Amino acid sequence: MKVREEIRLLRHGRDWRGRSTVPRTADPWVLEEEEREFPTAWARSRVAVMVRSGLQRRLLRPVTWSQTRPIVEGVEYLENLRAPAVFIANHSSHLDAPLIVSSLPRRFADRLAVGAAADYFFDARIRAAATVLFFNAFPVERHGSRRLRSLAVELLDDGWNLLLFPEGTRSEDGWMSAFKPGTAQLCVSKGVPVVPIALRGAYAAMPRGRNWPVPGRPRVSVRYGRPLYPAKGEGFRELRVRMMRAVARLAAEEEMGWYGALRADAEGSLALPGQAAAAGGAECRRIWESTRPLEPRPRRRVWT
């Protein structure tokens, strides 16, 4: 190990083996790190909204569409949807947000706030400013934060739509994991509709570790589903299951078609997020499955 690396580890309280140099008996007296403030209100001003709309239409969408071949389906389900709404999607790539923002009708995209990981996108000023400007992003703690949850509530109260990734982090192998309960709790408490979205091919196009899509304009699919409305007396646990089933069903349509995915869901043979990953075998096999390019889809009969 280089001397520079050793110094870095020691400076961060780790020895050359990566183990903590602080005695465990001292843990109760270690001061908790205070939550940092992330000013994002400026991105929701009238001027910022106009600038962001222009950047998304004239820069973000052309660049994203030039590097990938998106197939967008289900936008017609949004025709009668009233804002505010919460859009949810599986999360496997940094392409996810650009694909969704660029494919949404402008009446939703211009009033959209995107939840972004506070410890990744808001740890450096330049990256935070760019993320907030392009996506109207607001910080989301992976392990929950009461203050940041209240910000999501304030945004909904002000009429902003939200784009959230209920898994809490990007998938390491391209497979969906179980949804955290926070998004369902938010939707139940505010009584807002949830729009499920399934993305396929984004992991193969730009997996973890890449800062740019792979060459060759890989195919990706963005599929919107029917809005889900919290039923009267429905708890967040029940809504969470409905959300997972909806996204899993949309994702399965890529191979099964609409009717095949609907039938698999009705028969109980459609694996929910988390269950599918467990049944997918070793991690290397799941990664291989996720990095296979999407094949051109032949026309299917609805009933097949």
Give the role of each language-model region:
Residues 1-34, 39-40, 44, 51, ...:
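Non-catalytic C-terminal accessory region of glycerolipid acyltransferases
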Residues 79-143:
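Catalytic core of membrane glycerolipid acyltransferases/transacylases, capturing the structured
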Residues 60-91:
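Helix-to-loop junction immediately C-terminal to a conserved catalytic motif
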Residues 62-68, 139-143, 173-174:
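Short, flexible loop segments at the rims of nucleotide/cofactor-binding pockets, characterized by
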Residues 44-67, 123-135, 207-217, 276:
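Alpha-helical membrane-targeting segments
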